[in-house]
Amino acid sequence: IVAAHTAKVMVNDFLDTKKMAFPRFFFLSNDELLEILSEGKDPLRVQPFMKKCFEAVQKVEFTERVTMKTIVSVEGESVPLCKEIDPAETGAVEKWMLEFEDVMKASLLKVTRESVVSYTTKPREEWILDWPGQVVIAGSQVHWTKEVTDAIVAGGLKEYGEKSNVQLTNIVNMVRGELTKLERATMSALVTIDVHARDVVVQMSADGVHDPKDFKWLAQLRYFWEDDTLKCRMINAQAQYGFEYLGNSARLVI
């Protein structure tokens, strides 16, 4: 009995070291973690546990050389990794899982950067269809923040409210048209965001907001692309966007 207890304590201590090396292992039971560690040299057999560590990741696509190349969401959306990951080269499972986490975030950062830059190069309705749903929401909010700020300074909130109505109508018309399941999910989420954004602008116009430092504007969740990253601000609080992949799920709240 003593020997069995000692062995159990040693196993738990061993698993704790793995969890500390890759904290997302805390989402797994000890039995699941033991199974992952036993299969760690074969990433294809670890695949079923990816979703428990990364909620939006249904699976990862591999190359013929068994390097990780693409994230696939629960909804079937694909996002290419900015760098292929070779689990065999990295070694221990917690090390290549940690590398996957870093590369996932770097990939979302890269795609978001590209989307923000390309926003002004084509009609918004076309731009929306070029990017993953999460990136569309983030990129759109960056430009909304800038455009509303410019409208406040120029005294053009009323006109921007009218522009917001036109944009919203265009998106609703697209939702009613022929779209793929993923495109429709992106559009539906964007409608929720755009309705809220329109209402904010209309209310600020009615309240006579004319200063970007007005509390009514500062109290809104605003997105900024600064220092090559995405920052979110509200009143005097600021947080960096985490670039955790969220998939293309519905947005119930802003």
Predicted features along the sequence, with ranges:
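Conserved mid-sequence domains
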Residues: 40, 253-254
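Amphipathic alpha-helical packing elements
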Residues: 4-57
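Extended, charged/polar low-complexity intrinsically disordered regions
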Residues: 47, 51-253
